[in-house]
Amino acid sequence: MIRTLFSDTPFPPLEQALIEPNGLLAAGGDLSPERLISAYQQGIFPWFNQGEVILWWSPNPRMVLFPQELKISRSLHKTLKKNHYQIRTDSAFTQVMQACAAPREKQTGTWIHPEMVAAYTTLHQRGIAHSVETWVDGELVGGLYGVAIGKAFFGESMFSRVPDASKIALVYLARQLERQGYGLIDCQMKTAHLMSMGAREIPRLQFSKLLGKLTDQPEQNRKWHFDFTWPKQQ
């Protein structure tokens, strides 16, 4: 059995999460900024279909990308050197979420529905949720969004309309976060795409301990303005 959350119910301990489905911890509650911030600080995230009860997850193991471990393939490195794109932050947050919600091959439905868009847009307005965007000739062609708390970034979703567009956004995000002392990018679940870029699985307990240190650092709740000049040595 999983715990049912009401407006004032705290999350249960992570070790109470189910083994199957992996990481299901609780149901109910709401998507208020306070609830979402508390969830991320503890290594919990919402994931549910439109019209269903809110489900909260903390899978074990957890997929993370340590910024200093980012891997760039030869083909992606060539694309980066061409520099025919522009990287922006927080200039089209809702557009990025809507693009991430668009139907994808072999998928039926999406978990990024209007309720989620509204909740994360509120976080964005508070300077907590952010987007990193890849633009070409004034057109948004790829990007990602997530939540920043302390020195941890929690990635939520990414999209590409042209090859490598989301990878480019992730590369620039990782480089900027490394420069600013961020400890990790939470990738939630294992994917071959993220593993190819250096992400790896760690035990949930280790992830939780890292978050305890990283999210306890001073908040910088503001719109992001990064210097996206690609280092020449790269």
Swiss-Prot record:
Please give the biological process terms from Gene Ontology that the record holds. Answer: protein catabolic process
Q: Which GO terms describe its cellular component?
A: cytoplasm
Per the UniProt record, which EC number(s) apply here? 2.3.2.6
Among the GO molecular function terms of this UniProt record, one is: leucyl-tRNA--protein transferase activity
Keyword flag Cytoplasm: yes
Q: Which UniProt keywords apply?
A: Acyltransferase, Cytoplasm, Transferase
Has UniProt tagged this entry with the keyword Transferase? Answer: yes
User: Coiled coil where?
Assistant: none
The record's annotation in InterPro entries points to:
Acyl_CoA_acyltransferase, Leu/Phe-tRNA_Trfase, Leu/Phe-tRNA_Trfase_C, Leu/Phe-tRNA_Trfase_N
User: Record's Gene3D superfamilies?
Assistant: Leucyl/phenylalanyl-tRNA-protein transferase, C-terminal domain (3.40.630.70), Leucyl/phenylalanyl-tRNA-protein transferase, N-terminal domain (3.30.70.3550)
Its catalytic activity? N-terminal L-lysyl-[protein] + L-leucyl-tRNA(Leu) = N-terminal L-leucyl-L-lysyl-[protein] + tRNA(Leu) + H(+); N-terminal L-arginyl-[protein] + L-leucyl-tRNA(Leu) = N-terminal L-leucyl-L-arginyl-[protein] + tRNA(Leu) + H(+); L-phenylalanyl-tRNA(Phe) + an N-terminal L-alpha-aminoacyl-[protein] = an N-terminal L-phenylalanyl-L-alpha-aminoacyl-[protein] + tRNA(Phe)
- Name the major location: cytoplasm
State the source organism's domain of life. Bacteria
Where is this gene product found? Cytoplasm
Which Pfam family is an annotated match for this chain, by its short name? Leu_Phe_trans
Q: What is the recorded function of this protein according to its Swiss-Prot or TrEMBL entry?
A: Functions in the N-end rule pathway of protein degradation where it conjugates Leu, Phe and, less efficiently, Met from aminoacyl-tRNAs to the N-termini of proteins containing an N-terminal arginine or lysine.
Q: Which family does it belong to?
A: Belongs to the L/F-transferase family.
**What is the designated name of this protein?**
Leucyl/phenylalanyl-tRNA--protein transferase
Gene source species: Nitrosomonas eutropha (strain DSM 101675 / C91 / Nm57)
Q: Which gene encodes it?
A: aat
